[in-house]
Design a protein with these regions (language model features):
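PLP-dependent enzyme catalytic core of the Aspartate aminotransferase-like
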Residues: 42-113
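Conserved PLP-binding catalytic core of the aspartate aminotransferase-like
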Residues: 2-38, 58, 101-109
């Protein structure tokens, strides 16, 4: 699966420890949290606490794995196609942008009084 993600330049990978999969992002981004909604649209509900985790039972079949893999790939492709992973901003660039937006909102709020 990670090979396909890399080949398609999708900025994520999946690591696992037996029955726990962790969705990791390979590039900084401020909208990674939205991936859970793309997964849900593909029929895969994932609770989102920091990096996403999928828990599977020990009797998970190869067919079940293929369904999850397909949902993850379709969701990642859709998120990329929608432009949420465009750009090459670094983590510090993103922090600066968010800081400027917050400062602007505080100034705008004070001026609106």
């Amino acid at each position: 699966m990670n090979k396909v993600l890399a080949e398609e330049d999708l900025p994520m990978r999946v690591d696992n420890l037996t029955t726990v999969w962790t969705v990791l992002f390979t590039r900084p981004g401020r909208y990674h949290w939205m991936f859970q909604y793309y997964l849900r649209a593909e029929g895969l509900a994932l609770s989102w606490v920091g990096t996403g985790r999928c828990l599977f039972s020990l009797d998970f079949s190869e067919a079940d794995y293929e369904k999850v893999k397909g949902a993850l790939l379709r969701a990642a492709r859709a998120m990329k196609a929608d432009g949420w992973w465009d750009g090459n901003a670094s983590a510090s660039d993103i922090s600066k942008i968010i800081g400027k937006e917050m400062a602007w909102q505080m100034v705008a709020r004070r001026l609106a009084r």
